[in-house]
């Protein structure tokens, strides 16, 4: 079985007031080309399809058109199965509703994890519905033979997994839920077909390069042992830096995001091609690079010659910047006082007529003494946060102890307030 693994698309992201639709279209054109050339049996998207739980109409149209385009591309070689799971940025319930239609296109969308008043194992009807939703037989088309199995675990807060054993703490619920699904797969997988587990979560020990440690550090994380051993490849989403997980012998990997989400994500971006012959065999993994339409560029005064490190010394670099080079630009300046009041206007004037997109000035005050042990965020970092991410930093217990659907209600409230303020 050949799998195309990708994640963290973040469709609909606005970056410093710049719309990124063109960049996402550029990615999807590359993805269609990869599908055409690699002819995968399965396209697996491990969460964060959208950047927000209330995506715009334009973002939803781009998602739908791109998904149909990928499916149509696969028809030339007999089709491919598509499996998508919700990430922490997505509306899990909305994805579930959309999935009712997508299933007719050989596509499974797994948004939420079912709950019931009676979650004991004696409730056979409940767990039959759980197995039907989260254990997905992979078929190139709806009439073809089974090639393998996907066990799909969307983003879910620990306390919102089914309470299979009342003695479990909330951190144990996820592990027991996954074990239950893998045991069921082992029962039905009598032909020794490959088993793929996919989840959108933070795995302990992951390289979080590009993510703000303050934000990521406040999220629930799971060690590799949480996922058991009844799978051949663990397809992960959530962390944008592509990597294999330590201790997994190369079987567990983050594909990473296809385009950079911030200036710290100035590394190469990929999708993974994974090939597995049968259950128990080592997966063969290849990374296929994705070319960003706009690169992230930081021009820093630190890199200028001594004696020429003022904010004004960066302006000639902007005047001489290649006119047709598509980049987002961040300036890093070293200043002890306030910037000149017309500095930003000078920056924008220097880039007039160029395709470079100015974003921000990051001001660092040299040798600034520490002001305490509390966490702090720069204005730029605050501006890049969503309201939910900011709330999770300020009041993490609010989300950790909340019932299923609370986060989406919070997002909807933010959206409604935004509409009233327009």
Each predicted region: which residue ranges?
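Accessory, non-catalytic peripheral segments of nucleic-acid enzymes
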Residues: 42, 276-422
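Extreme N-terminal starter segment of soluble prokaryotic enzymes
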Residues: 1-4
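Conserved beta-sheet core of the metallophosphoesterase superfamily
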Residues: 103, 203-205, 209-280
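Active-site environment of divalent metal-dependent phosphoester hydrolases
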Residues: 10-13, 51-54, 85-96, 117-118, ...
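Core catalytic region of metal-dependent phosphoesterases/phosphodiesterases
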Residues: 19-128, 227
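Active-site neighborhood of phospho(di)ester-bond hydrolases with catalytic His/Asp-centered motifs
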Residues: 6-7, 43-48, 81-88, 108-115, ...
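Binuclear metal-dependent phosphoesterase catalytic core
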Residues: 121-126, 130-144, 250-323
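Conserved catalytic scaffold of divalent metal-dependent phosphoesterases
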Residues: 104-218, 255
């Amino acid at each position: 079985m050949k799998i195309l693994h990708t994640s963290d698309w973040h469709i609909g992201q606005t970056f410093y007031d710049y719309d990124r639709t063109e960049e996402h279209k550029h990615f999807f054109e590359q993805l269609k080309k990869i599908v055409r050339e690699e002819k995968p049996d399965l396209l697996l998207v491990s969460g964060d399809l959208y950047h927000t739980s209330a995506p715009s109409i334009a973002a939803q149209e781009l998602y739908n058109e791109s998904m149909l385009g990928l499916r149509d591309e696969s028809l030339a070689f007999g089709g491919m199965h598509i499996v998508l799971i919700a990430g922490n940025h997505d509306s899990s319930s909305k994805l579930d509703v959309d999935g009712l239609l997508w299933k007719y296109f050989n596509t499974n969308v797994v948004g939420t994890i079912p709950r019931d008043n009676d979650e004991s194992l004696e409730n056979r009807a409940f767990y039959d519905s759980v197995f039907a939703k989260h254990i997905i037989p992979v078929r190139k088309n709806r009439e073809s033979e089974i090639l393998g199995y996907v066990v799909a675990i969307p983003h879910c807060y620990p306390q919102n997994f089914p309470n299979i054993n009342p003695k479990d703490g909330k951190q144990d619920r996820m592990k027991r839920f996954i074990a239950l699904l893998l045991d069921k797969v082992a029962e039905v997988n009598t032909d020794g077909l490959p088993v793929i587990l996919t989840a959108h979560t933070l795995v302990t020990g992951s390289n979080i390069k590009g993510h703000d440690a303050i934000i990521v550090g406040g999220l629930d994380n799971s060690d590799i042992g949480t996922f058991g051993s009844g799978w051949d490849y663990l397809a992960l989403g959530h962390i944008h830096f592509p990597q294999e997980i330590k201790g997994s012998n190369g079987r567990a990997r983050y594909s990473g995001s296809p385009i950079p989400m911030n200036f710290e994500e100035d590394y190469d971006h990929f999708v993974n091609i994974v090939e597995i012959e049968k259950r128990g065999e080592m997966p063969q993994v290849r990374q296929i690079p994705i070319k960003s339409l706009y690169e992230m560029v930081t021009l820093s005064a630190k890199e200028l010659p001594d004696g020429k490190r003022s904010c004004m010394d960066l302006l000639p670099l902007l005047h001489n910047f290649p006119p047709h080079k598509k980049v987002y630009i961040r300036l890093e300046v070293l200043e002890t006082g306030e910037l000149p009041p017309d500095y930003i206007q000078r920056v924008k004037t220097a880039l007039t007529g160029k395709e470079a997109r100015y974003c921000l000035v990051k001001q660092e005050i040299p040798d600034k003494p520490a002001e305490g042990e509390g966490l702090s965020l720069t204005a730029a970092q605050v501006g890049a946060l969503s309201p939910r991410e900011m709330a999770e930093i300020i009041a993490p217990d609010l989300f950790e102890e909340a019932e299923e659907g609370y986060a989406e209600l919070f997002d909807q409230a933010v959206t409604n307030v935004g509409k009233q303020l327009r």
